[in-house]
A protein has these predicted regions:
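Short, gly/Ser/Thr-rich active-site loops of penicillin-recognizing serine hydrolases
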Residues: 321, 337-339, 367-389
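Short, conserved catalytic-motif segment at the N-terminal edge
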Residues: 23-83, 103, 113, 163-171
Length: 389
């Protein structure tokens, strides 16, 4: 979501994990854990929290490394990370829930629900569905400054979105013609949800998605507990001479002190939570995975129909780098891979996350890490090499 990649990240080659998956040789949980521990030991990432879902339950969850380097607080399944764009799965789930409740039509113009949605008109208007699957034609402006320190006031949400739309009124393509990722489209969806329900995006999501799933520690603010039991600190590997430029690139108060080869980030929030604002841990994120692996039902509670869940996972428009469903996507490199999967990544300043489901295997993986970038592919490939039961 926020590309910040100045400096050197001593990542680990993705080949080891991919070789495991391609060879098809099952590995033990112990071997998988050793692989994940090595990511910490080699400096690929300060801390990782990982969970696995099989069928309708979480079968494994563990933390590796540190949630906070200054205090040596360990990363755990309960450690909260800023989800960034992984939030879009929640936003899409919320929109589909409204559609199934008869509150909106996915194929109706989005402007019918959010009157502030004004763009230079094409022959056909932008629909809600096209916002969900990134085929609206909306631009994707760099969101590097769409953040604020956690102690700064939250701006007027609607006014913020209207200002962005005023700057990007001209669509890049005819709606529905092709797919191109747009954070702005999901900001508009957040306003659609708010206009329809009369509640804020956060209030609706808490009441209709997070609370029914028992995701009580997941929300839109950082927990008050110490790091490890609370929130992870995000890090960016950065050469020291670049530190002043890095501070200037982000809003004042977001970039924190240096810690060894890293720059730490102070707690911050995104402006417009519908595109990337959820804060939570892998332990509770598995409940969202269970919902999408089990036809819209989790712990005996149905939030979506099986048809709606299938529609979200059905990949239709093809984009330049990814092919999209409603919320979910997959990269071009994943076409034809087995087992097939859909996913959503979430990355920005100090954090990189992935939520991936393998519907044919009834398997789901959530990985959260507190560095701007790391190789999640080898991690996922290694995890699915375990014969989960």
């Amino acid at each position: 979501m926020m590309p910040v990649s100045v400096g050197r990240n001593r990542g680990v080659s993705r080949s080891k994990g991919i070789r495991m998956a391609q060879l098809g040789s099952p590995i033990s949980i112990e071997a998988m854990e050793a692989f994940l521990s090595a990511r910490i030991e080699t400096g690929a990432v300060p801390g990782l929290s990982v969970s696995v879902v099989k069928g309708d339950r979480s079968v494994w969850a563990k933390g590796f490394g540190f949630a906070d380097l200054a205090t040596s607080s360990p990363a755990t399944p309960q450690t909260s990370y800023l989800w960034f764009s992984m939030t879009k799965i929640v936003t899409a789930t919320a929109v589909l829930r409204l559609a199934e409740g008869g509150k909106l039509d996915l194929d109706a113009p989005a402007g019918e629900y959010f009157r502030g949605f004004k763009v230079i008109s094409q022959p056909t208007p932008v629909t809600v569905r096209q916002l969900l699957n990134h085929s609206s034609g909306l631009a994707n402006p760099l969101p590097i400054r769409w953040v604020r320190p956690a102690d700064a006031p939250d701006p007027d949400r609607g006014a913020f979105v209207r200002r962005l739309l005023a700057k990007h009124r001209r669509l890049k393509s005819v709606p529905g013609e092709r797919a191109s990722y747009s954070n702005l489209g999901y900001l508009v969806l957040g306003e659609v949800i708010s206009e329809i329900t009369g509640a804020s995006y956060e209030e609706y999501v808490r009441e209709e998605i997070l609370s029914p799933l028992g995701m009580d520690s997941t929300g839109f603010t950082y927990p008050e507990q110490p790091a490890g039991d609370g929130a992870a600190t995000g890090y960016q590997p950065l050469w020291r001479p670049f530190t002043p430029l890095f501070r200037a690139a982000l809003p004042r108060g977001v970039v924190g002190p240096r810690q060894g080869r890293y720059v730490a980030f102070n707690p911050f929030y995104v402006k417009g939570p519908a595109y990337g604002g959820i804060v939570g841990g892998v332990g509770e994120a598995t409940r969202l995975v269970v919902l999408h692996l089990n036809g819209g039902q989790a712990d005996g509670k149905r939030l979506l129909s099986a048809q709606a869940v299938a529609e979200m996972q059905r990949i239709t428009p093809r984009g330049g780098k990814r092919d999209f469903g409603l919320g979910w996507f997959r990269s071009h490199e994943a076409r034809g891979r087995r087992p097939a999967f859909v996913e959503h990544l979430g990355g920005g300043a100090g954090f990189w996350n992935v939520m991936r489901i393998y519907p044919e295997e009834s398997l789901g993986v959530v990985v959260m890490g507190n560095i701007t970038s790391y190789d999640h592919e080898s991690i996922c490939d290694t995890i699915i090499s375990v014969p989960w039961e």
